[in-house]
């Protein structure tokens, strides 16, 4: 019996075979690109070890920072700090940016720029300032702007001893040319830390880690690749970046228990979409070098807001940007005719404050020996010119970020800028400072595994929650009008809180130059440390108390972690229960406090621990209450109490 013929296999056509070969080659090429470039540079997706909990940022780092990048001398730092103090701006931290050393990075202060560095910086510490120094991971053979521009001996010493990764492999970067310190070499670290101790011994509080770590690389033949040999073996760019942040942070903590590093989170999301710093070293983060303008495509404030919110989605907690941007010149159309008219017609709105100059120098005859003042733009020379409304709106946005970083290129002496800039930036600088108890409490919660301080929302361009109780919709263009998408719930406009707005809803309204689109949740309990009258919630006398803003609705509570006891986490919990009467309960740590309670009507009685409190014309004395009918606020001031249980009645 004959076998049936086996069907012949259909022979593939030559176009198919060519396409298949091309497909295989493409897959191989993609795999090579991924394993040789993408994986060692980004670490994606094998980087879960970088996504741990954020460290506990100390409260001082949440207060206002100041710096400049045009002069960089002791005399100019003094002028900045003395001027900000004279005009009553809150400044806790001064950032010393490059160049400050003899060469990059020997950590030796250039005494031409800082004639008596130890005396100067110890003196700043004695005045209550925190001091942070700029640095990178580079050991340079050539430096562009330091006192010693040729430093081959410095580089060769490190290379010959094996202190540099890749046997001293050098790259060009924006400050010169050098090699990478080897964070895996114990002897290299001993030498490196010895250099750093020159300033750490004076009480330095942190490093600004600039972004040379992302340049870590080597060569395969003539091909530049994102990996190189270190003391312990091969190291990728991504691994080097993690060592850079972690080592500098951890060693700093051995010298100062409140040490921080200022390090990038995102800086244009396509450069490192996984984030520059590992989360577990990200005490304070910023988003790189933005320009003094509005638009995203120009790397203006829209770019900063976008990068900050994307950083928050990655889990970074304390994030910010250079107020007004880092560099560049504002575009001619950044200040339109309507805004220019508002700036030109600005009338002072500041309350009288003791020991603060009553008049901006731009409105008076120029003081002897001082530079004439511009009433339109700042007096920065060259191309780093900042439009006034850019400075104002950026400062307002930064108020509702964890990191308020006022500095960069351009005129930063606000008393030499316009009157509205001086008054509005001062007002919002104080508002940010007064919100530190609220921010710090959320930072503690994030450190313990909770959500970040800033929480981007899906609805509304650039909308985010700032902690549990504030909705922020930043102004990102030269317009007074903004449409805000309110989430579900009830909300009040923070700068005029009379009206309750029901969400979800879209609200369109004008926001004057000295206000910002911020809404507070009905039911919010907000701790603040009021120290000045600029924000309208107290004055200098309030500094002895913790001020609590209460917007009663149903049951709500807030746990305050006291900044002044850091790193010990002492807390006070305030519970609010509203109905026919209002009950407020304090528990745990006792502290003098002022309650500012939204109330449509004046109460008939106020008691604490079953004891009736007297009404006063104004709550200037302890153990009394007053009612501000204009603002519909009940104000209670208490220094001592037994249990801290209030009962407020309207019958």
Where on the chain are the PLM-derived regions?
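Juxtamembrane low-complexity tails/linkers enriched in Ser/Thr-Pro and polybasic
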Residues: 2-12
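N-terminal Sec-pathway targeting helices
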Residues: 10-29
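Hydrophobic alpha-helical membrane-insertion segments, chiefly the h-region
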Residues: 28-39
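Catalytic-domain carbohydrate-binding cleft regions of carbohydrate-active enzymes
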Residues: 39-514
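Non-catalytic C-terminal accessory modules of carbohydrate-active enzymes
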Residues: 351-354, 408-624, 628-633, 640-643
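Low-complexity, intrinsically disordered segments enriched in Ser/Thr together with acidic residues
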Residues: 644-645, 649-651
């Amino acid at each position: 019996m004959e076998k049936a013929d086996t069907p012949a296999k259909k022979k593939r056509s030559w176009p198919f075979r060519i396409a298949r070969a091309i497909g295989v080659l493409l897959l191989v090429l993609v795999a090579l690109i991924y394993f040789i470039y993408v994986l060692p540079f980004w670490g994606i997706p094998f980087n879960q070890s970088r996504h741990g909990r954020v460290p506990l940022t100390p409260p001082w780092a949440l207060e206002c920072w100041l710096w400049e990048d045009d002069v960089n001398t002791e005399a100019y730092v003094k002028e900045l700090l003395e001027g900000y103090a004279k005009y009553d701006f809150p400044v806790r931290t001064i950032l010393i940016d490059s160049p400050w050393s003899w060469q990059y990075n020997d950590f030796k202060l250039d005494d031409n720029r800082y004639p008596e560095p130890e005396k100067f910086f110890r003196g700043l510490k004695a005045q209550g300032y925190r001091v942070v120094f700029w640095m990178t991971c580079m050991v340079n053979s050539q430096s562009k702007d330091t006192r010693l521009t040729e430093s081959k001996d410095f580089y060769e010493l490190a290379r010959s001893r094996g202190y540099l990764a890749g046997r001293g492999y050098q790259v060009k970067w924006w400050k010169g040319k050098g090699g990478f310190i080897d964070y895996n070499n114990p002897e290299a670290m001993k030498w490196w830390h010895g250099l750093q101790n020159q300033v750490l011994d004076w009480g330095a509080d942190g490093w600004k880690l600039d972004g040379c770590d992302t340049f870590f690389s080597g060569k395969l033949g003539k091909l530049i690749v994102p990996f190189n040999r270190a003391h312990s073996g091969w190291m990728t760019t991504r691994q080097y970046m993690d060592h850079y942040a972690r080592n500098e942070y951890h060693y700093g903590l051995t010298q100062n228990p409140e040490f921080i590093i200022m390090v990038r989170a995102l800086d244009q999301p396509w450069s490192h979409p996984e984030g520059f710093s590992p989360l577990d070293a990200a005490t304070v983060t910023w988003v790189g070098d933005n320009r003094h303008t509005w638009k995203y495509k120009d790397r203006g404030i829209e770019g900063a807001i976008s990068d900050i919110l994307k950083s928050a989605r990655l889990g970074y907690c304390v994030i910010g940007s250079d107020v007004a941007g880092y560099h560049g010149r504002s575009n001619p159309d950044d200040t339109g005719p309507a805004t220019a008219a508002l700036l030109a017609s600005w009338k002072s709105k500041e309350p009288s404050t003791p020991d603060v100059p009553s008049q901006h120098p731009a409105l008076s005859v120029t003081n002897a020996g001082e530079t004439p003042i511009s009433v339109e733009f700042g007096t920065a020379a060259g191309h780093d010119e900042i439009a006034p409304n850019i400075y104002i709106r950026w400062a307002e946005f930064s108020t509702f970020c964890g990191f308020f970083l006022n500095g960069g290129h351009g005129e930063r002496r606000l008393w030499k800028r316009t009157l509205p800039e001086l008054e509005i930036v001062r007002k919002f600088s104080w508002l940010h400072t007064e919100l530190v108890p609220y921010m710090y409490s959320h930072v503690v919660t994030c450190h313990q595994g909770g959500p970040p301080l800033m929480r981007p929302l899906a609805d509304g361009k650039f909308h985010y929650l700032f902690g549990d109780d504030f909705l922020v919709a930043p102004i990102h263009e030269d317009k007074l009008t903004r449409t805000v998408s309110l989430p579900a719930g009830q909300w009040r406009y923070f700068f005029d809180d009379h009206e309750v707005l029901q969400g979800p809803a879209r609200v369109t309204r004008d926001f004057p130059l000295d206000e910002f689109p911020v809404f507070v949740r009905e039911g919010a309990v907000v701790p603040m440390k009021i120290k000045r009258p600029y924000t309208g919630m107290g004055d200098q006398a309030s500094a002895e108390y913790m001020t609590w803003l209460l917007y009663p609705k149903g049951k709500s509570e807030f746990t305050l972690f006291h900044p002044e006891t850091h790193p010990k986490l002492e807390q006070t919990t305030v519970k609010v229960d509203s109905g026919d009467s209002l009950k407020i309960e304090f528990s745990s740590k006792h502290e003098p406090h002022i309650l500012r309670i939204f109330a449509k009507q004046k109460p008939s009685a106020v008691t604490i621990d079953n004891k009736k409190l007297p009404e006063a014309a104004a709550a200037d004395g302890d153990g009394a209450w007053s009612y501000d009918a204009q603002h519909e606020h009940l104000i209670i001031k208490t220094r001592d109490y037994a249990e801290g249980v209030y009962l407020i009645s309207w019958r």
